[in-house]
């Protein structure tokens, strides 16, 4: 009989989920979930499940009995959230989160919830702390914040991670802007990038590693800013990538949020991560992380 902690991962085929599968398997007994896309889940103990089906979800808890649940499943693309019926986004991002919290309480499991930096106002200054004003301006961000609230209303055995812009190279259907930028630059295509939108980006595999470290430290109930330590614009991130990967910086085109009037004008949700660092977490610089990504790519 295994004495390893049992970890249930939702969204195992998603952008972060694929890295959590690789990072946590072997160190823990994992069960990773997927729905429409398998991703890399077929390489691990996994199950296809519609997480909005409460009966199936309850059966999964009954059979697997997790010690920790990492809830990474969501309608996580703000643009995708706009294109879907609001009721569907709410069901996945809010109702499912509440159901998971209730099941975690029932089975005495800890819940790690991947929220977003986009819950912050975006106009209150830079390097925001966890108690900064919360003003989500998109349906996606609003439902992620509602997810936080639902969890807190259910129980207090949780860790909420307000996740920054994640970047890296995906091996599944779930891609990201950084990967698209790299491929365009590699092909000699110009890439328009915001000069006036600031985040604290975090590499995907660093995110998975940090979650692993937090689990090992037996985390207590908290809400944490979950990002890198550097505040950069999208354009500056592109410049770092070009510098590390010897790509043509002249292909980077400066654009402003003002150039796209229909785009949510979220100017600055860069986050202060002192609280995260207080766990003894080592955060790599963006240049260090990208250097490792490019090295592995070759």
Listing of model-derived features with the role each one plays in the protein:
Residues 10, 33, 69-73, 111-117, ...:
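SDR active-site strand-loop-helix element
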Residues 51-92:
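NAD(P)H-binding glycine-rich loop region in Rossmannoid oxidoreductase-like domains
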Residues 42-53:
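Rossmann-fold cofactor-recognition segment
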Residues 264-298:
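C-terminal amphipathic/interface module of NAD(P)-dependent oxidoreductases
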Residues 210, 217-261:
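Mid/C-terminal beta-alpha module of Rossmann-like enzyme folds, strongest
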Residues 4-26:
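N-terminal Rossmann NAD(P)H-binding glycine-rich loop of SDR-like oxidoreductase domains
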Residues 149-199, 206, 212-213:
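NAD(P)-dependent short-chain dehydrogenase/reductase
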Residues 91, 95-96, 119-161, 165-167:
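Catalytic helix-loop patch of NAD(P)-dependent Rossmann-fold dehydrogenases
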């Amino acid at each position: 009989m295994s004495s390893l902690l049992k970890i249930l991962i939702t969204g195992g085929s998603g952008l972060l989920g694929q890295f959590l599968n690789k990072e946590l398997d072997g160190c823990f007994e994992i069960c990773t979930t997927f729905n429409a896309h398998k991703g890399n889940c077929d390489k691990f103990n996994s199950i296809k499940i519609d997480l909005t089906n409460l009966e199936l979800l309850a059966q999964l808890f009954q059979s697997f009995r997790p010690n920790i649940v990492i809830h990474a499943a969501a309608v996580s693309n703000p643009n995708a959230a706009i294109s879907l019926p609001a009721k569907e986004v709410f069901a996945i991002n809010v109702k499912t989160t509440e159901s998971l919290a209730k099941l975690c309480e029932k089975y005495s499991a800890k819940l790690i919830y991947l929220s977003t930096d986009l819950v912050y106002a975006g106009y209150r200054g830079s390097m925001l702390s966890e108690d900064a004003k919360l003003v989500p301006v998109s349906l996606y961000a609003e439902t992620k914040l509602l997810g936080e609230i639902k969890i807190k209303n259910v129980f207090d055995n949780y860790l909420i991670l307000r996740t920054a812009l994640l970047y890296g190279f995906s091996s599944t259907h779930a891609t990201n802007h950084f990967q698209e930028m790299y491929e365009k630059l590699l092909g000699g295509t110009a890439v328009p990038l915001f000069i006036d939108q600031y985040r604290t980006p975090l590499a995907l595999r660093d995110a998975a590693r940090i979650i692993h470290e937090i689990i090992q430290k037996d985390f207590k109930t908290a809400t944490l800013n979950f990002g890198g330590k550097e505040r950069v614009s999208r354009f500056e991130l592109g410049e770092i990538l070009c510098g590390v990967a010897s790509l043509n910086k002249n292909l980077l085109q400066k654009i402003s949020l003002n150039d796209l009037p229909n785009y949510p004008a979220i100017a600055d949700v860069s986050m202060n991560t002192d609280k995260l660092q207080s766990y003894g977490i080592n955060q790599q610089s963006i240049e260090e992380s990208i250097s490792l990504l490019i090295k592995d790519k070759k």
